[in-house]
Amino acid sequence: MTSTKLIEYLIEGYANSEDSSFLIPNSTKDFLAVRPSGNPISAKGLVEMFNSKDLVAESSELVKTHKIEIFGDIAYAVFTLNEIFSYKGNQNKDLSTYTCIFKHENGTWKYS
């Protein structure tokens, strides 16, 4: 299977995950996300946020993968998700565009 296909599967896996169990096994130890607020957060921090009672994920759907570029053991992808979630009881419907970096470690592509 090509690296592009493997990264597409990671994107689809994240989009279709119904809980936070997808992220930790599919991310590097040094994974870092930067939220729209500008605050960085680790994979563990994201899992804790999604497992809190304040945040309730209702649905997530991959709308489009815009681009995947691979440079050796590093890649990036840009994709859009249609997400519905509630935060502290307030429902949000977001069309969110993500830019993600991936690393190829020990024969496996992971979110970085």
Annotated model-derived regions:
Residues 4-9, 20-70:
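A solvent-exposed, acidic/Ser-Thr-rich amphipathic alpha-helical stretch
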Residues 34, 78-80, 112:
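Beta-strand residues in well-ordered beta-sheet regions across diverse protein folds
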Residues 56, 84-93:
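Short, cysteine-centered beta-strand-loop-beta hairpins and adjacent loop/turn segments enriched
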Residues 60-63, 78-80, 93-98:
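Short, surface-exposed coil-to-beta transition loops
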Residues 72-83:
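A short hydrophobic beta-strand element
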Residues 95-112:
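Short beta-strand edge/turn micro-motifs at domain boundaries
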